Amino acid sequence: MAEITTIARPYAKAAFDFAIENNAVDSWAEMLNFAAMVSENETIKPLLAGGLASNKLAELFIGVCGEQVNEQGQNLLKVMAENGRLEVLPAVAQQFVELCNEWAKEIEATVVSAVELTSEQQQDISVSLEKRLARKVKLNCSIDASLVAGVIITAGDLVIDGSVRGKISRLSDTLQS
């Protein structure tokens, strides 16, 4: 079982990352669940076990899935077929769901800036943090004029100091050492 999970994880992670980037998590979850059901079908299962060339297997499998799987989903299925991994589709779908559940958790991020941030700047910061942390982010913004310019972002154990005050402090430390 651990071996199947190990094999499935990179495929699930790649699909999840792609789905996040394209804001298509729900459609990818549906596609993977459908493809997993197809792979467990009693007629299809023996074909996955061997004998068929990978390109023919991918073509057949994609044909069975039909419109339920979009072009990017078909590309994933082709790669999995080329590597003889279509049998682990149920585990890929399960791993994908686990990644979705983890991602659905929200993390609070504190953003301290020298001046008030516009809603567009807050949105940009939020999107960047969501990509980096692979979680939904709720921003708590505050103003500290002593930063001179820039921002300090704190999210969990991640601290990003992009303030002028921080840069001056690091420069001072470097010069004193």
Curated annotation (Swiss-Prot):
Location(s), subcellular: Cell inner membrane
Protein name: ATP synthase subunit delta
Gene3D superfamilies: N-terminal domain of the delta subunit of the F1F0-ATP synthase
Naturally occurring in which organism (per UniProt): Shewanella sediminis (strain HAW-EB3)
GO molecular function: proton-transporting ATP synthase activity, rotational mechanism
Keywords for this protein: ATP synthesis, Cell inner membrane, Cell membrane, CF(1), Hydrogen ion transport, Ion transport, Membrane, Transport
HAMAP family cross-referenced by the UniProt entry: ATP_synth_delta_bact
GO (cellular component) term, any one: plasma membrane
InterPro entries attached to this UniProt entry: ATP_synth_OSCP/delta_N_sf, ATPase_OSCP/dsu
Entry membrane topology: Peripheral membrane protein
Encoding gene, per UniProt annotation: atpH
Quaternary context: F-type ATPases have 2 components, F(1) - the catalytic core - and F(0) - the membrane proton channel. F(1) has five subunits: alpha(3), beta(3), gamma(1), delta(1), epsilon(1). F(0) has three main subunits: a(1), b(2) and c(10-14). The alpha and beta chains form an alternating ring which encloses part of the gamma chain. F(1) is attached to F(0) by a central stalk formed by the gamma and epsilon chains, while a peripheral stalk is formed by the delta and b chains.
Family: Belongs to the ATPase delta chain family.
The protein's role, per its UniProt record: F(1)F(0) ATP synthase produces ATP from ADP in the presence of a proton or sodium gradient. F-type ATPases consist of two structural domains, F(1) containing the extramembraneous catalytic core and F(0) containing the membrane proton channel, linked together by a central stalk and a peripheral stalk. During catalysis, ATP synthesis in the catalytic domain of F(1) is coupled via a rotary mechanism of the central stalk subunits to proton translocation.
